[in-house]
Amino acid sequence: MAQNSLRLVEDKSVDKSKALEAALSQIERAFGKGSIMKLGAKDSVVEIETVSTGSLGLDIALGIGGLPKGRIVEIYGPESSGKTTLALQTIAEAQKKGGICGFVDAEHALDPIYARKLGVDLENLLISQPDTGEQALEITDTLVRSGAIDVLVVDSVAALVPRAEIEGEMGDSLPGMQARLMSQALRKLTASISKSNCMVIFINQIRMKIGVMFGSPETTTGGNALKFYASVRLDIRRIGSVKEREEVVGNQTRVKVVKNKMAPPFKQVEFDIMYGEGVSKTGELIDLGVKAGIVEKSGAWFSYNSQRLGQGRENAKLFLRDNPELLREIETALRQNAGLIADRFLENGGPESEGDEAADM
């Protein structure tokens, strides 16, 4: 084995720039050109490419205008809270920009009719329904390494069942096997995801920890590895119902940015998810407009630039739906004031309130 040409030099008079140049050239000879560089040498390294979530409020709360590409994202929450809807809306937004998307349906529960209603182009959506967790993660790894995928969704971590568990009998105890599977897969995936600039969204479920006296008893499945590797973690909750007279037509939803490596975390935003429609864009623009002072609210009346939108929130939503030019004008004004909204108007729940919030649900 060849000896290293570099050695520790104790002489303080040595030229550091020459020593650094020698070290860099040795690293490049050993591992190839581009294995080490100055961060500012490539502008593309600094810029963060994003994909919209389909919710303007959530894009603002994330601080960078959407979910980051080349990163791992985790969306978790209780049942029927809107996890898959949010992931499908992100796929739809990526496809609008010409991106190629994939969906690893480990739960075998994807509804193509609902996905189409959310704006997903089913003809160009890659879908896989694997039999085991190992198969699902191998497919994920292969797609990511191809470098052709922009957004890949894995639904869900809880359904990634290890092969040994499937081949075993009911009642067999296999502690920690799923956590080990996820830990190994994420170790392999992380570098590939960054190099291919592919966003991988893991949807996760909630479980209860037994015997917890203080703090939140909730935890996510698949061990702790995903919590560490994820650049963004979103906690999505259903906080109420949207009604038309006596009929329930949607859910009021709250999303909290629990972890964010790209911008300040712990921001939270609320919006409506309408059945068969997805995130209510008009309702969200009205709410954000009122918070930013762009849309005026006087009693039950909503108005914009002295033009009345309607009496009551639902009537204002219908008016904006019938007037897309006015809707776009309000959206443009909100995007121009995105920094102001993020700083002043989005509720900012610190980490200490996370356990209390979970307990209130």
Curated annotation (Swiss-Prot):
Keywords: ATP-binding, Cytoplasm, DNA damage, DNA recombination, DNA repair, DNA-binding, Nucleotide-binding, SOS response. SUPFAM superfamilies: P-loop containing nucleoside triphosphate hydrolases (SSF52540), RecA protein, C-terminal domain (SSF54752). The keyword Oxidoreductase does not apply. Gene3D superfamilies: P-loop containing nucleotide triphosphate hydrolases. One of its GO terms (biological process) is DNA repair. One of its GO terms (molecular function) is ATP hydrolysis activity. This is Protein RecA.
